[in-house]
Amino acid sequence: MSLVPDFSRRGFIRLAVAAPLLGQIAAKNAFATAATALGKNPRQNVYTRLGVRTVINCRGTWTYLSGSLEFPEVTAAQRQASEYFVNMFELQHAASRRLAELTGSEAGMVTSGAAGAMASATAACMAGGDPKNVWQLPDTTGLKDEVIMMGGRSAFDNAIRLTGAKLVLAETPEELASAINNSTAMIYTTHLGNALVSENIVAKKFNIPILLDDAAGIPPIDNLKLYAKMGLDLYTFSGGKGLRGPQCSGLLLGRKDLIEAAMKNTSPWEGSVCRAMKVGKEEIVGLLTAVETWLKTDLNALNREWNARVQRIEKLVQTVPGVETDISIPADGNRYPTLHISWDEKKWGYTVKDCVQQLRVGDPVIEVAGADNPSIVPAVHEGNPKRSSQEEPERRNLELVSSTIQPNEVLIVGQRIRELLNAARKAAPGA
């Protein structure tokens, strides 16, 4: 019988597995020290010169963390687009035709993010393309002006309300059918799967346009074509998240008549309610290029690469006794290999929130998904206020989203989390 406890044997094995990574960390630290001694700072850039710290982003494509990093092809296309003048009406329609070719939808347009698509779509469903109605918004007198929100309020529904629309809340297909009346202009949903199919059936029955907001729905890129095949009237994606296009861009796809109306309710039309949501020639060309690039990309190969990044971090943090980890891909959006890290918070006297904050204030700044959302207006209450519901439980693990972690950041992240967890474990009462 072995005299070495099982726990210690597991710890030894984990250390052995992580040994090559720990060696790389030591070499990397030595190189950084030497570079500093020579007066060179490898992290200096346009942001640090402004006094703004760059971030190692393990949280994903959040807007407050500047979304995603563009495909190199997108950056190159934007630079070329910036060198010419062009008629924006002509460019919008050319982009619409190209998006139709790429996605199978009848038409499409580039918007100022998915929220801009929500506003343009709502205006289109209320005012159509009639110039008098376009100029009238956000005054909705005499127009259909109710939008049924499936699932309740959202932090983003002001994109709908600013057009003058009124919100009506519904949760089930039955409630949706009951809520439809002569003032209903549009149905808004974020639901996927069977729920979306059921809602689309109701929308078709009553001839009411439905808008699907799937801002974080790419990857997979197949969703561009899936919703067209489902016959959705309108659907939107963020351009600055998984699509890796310009941060301030979005895609609105769907019926040609509604896309044409959406174009007439936004920039460059002067007097349109969405005029402020301007997108330039660079965003239009850049997002088209992002779609084209994605359609040539091997998602399986990307997933293997992303998975390898978080696996290396996992090996490092697993050397801390008492830490549990797993890697999975979410099914409802932000579909990237994601590392979950947990420990006995009560026993250690160290919470997920504590760890998130220490990572955030460190050097370098590391952002992970934890127990907070620093970018939400504190007064926001999502869902249906008429329903009695409990607060969402506080997150009990760290989440690291692989797609925004850069290859040269993997060891930095793994070692920093390992250091924090080791220190917390050793400082725990009774340790």
Regions found by a protein language model. Name each.
Residues 71-113, 124:
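Conserved N-terminal alpha-helix of the aminotransferase class I/II PLP-enzyme fold
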Residues 11-16, 20, 38-56, 60-68, ...:
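Conserved PLP-enzyme active-site core in the AAT-like
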Residues 88-93, 107-108, 274-278, 297-306, ...:
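Flexible, glycine/charged-enriched surface loops at secondary-structure junctions
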Residues 61-69, 79-90, 301, 404:
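A short N-terminal beta->alpha junction/helix N-cap motif
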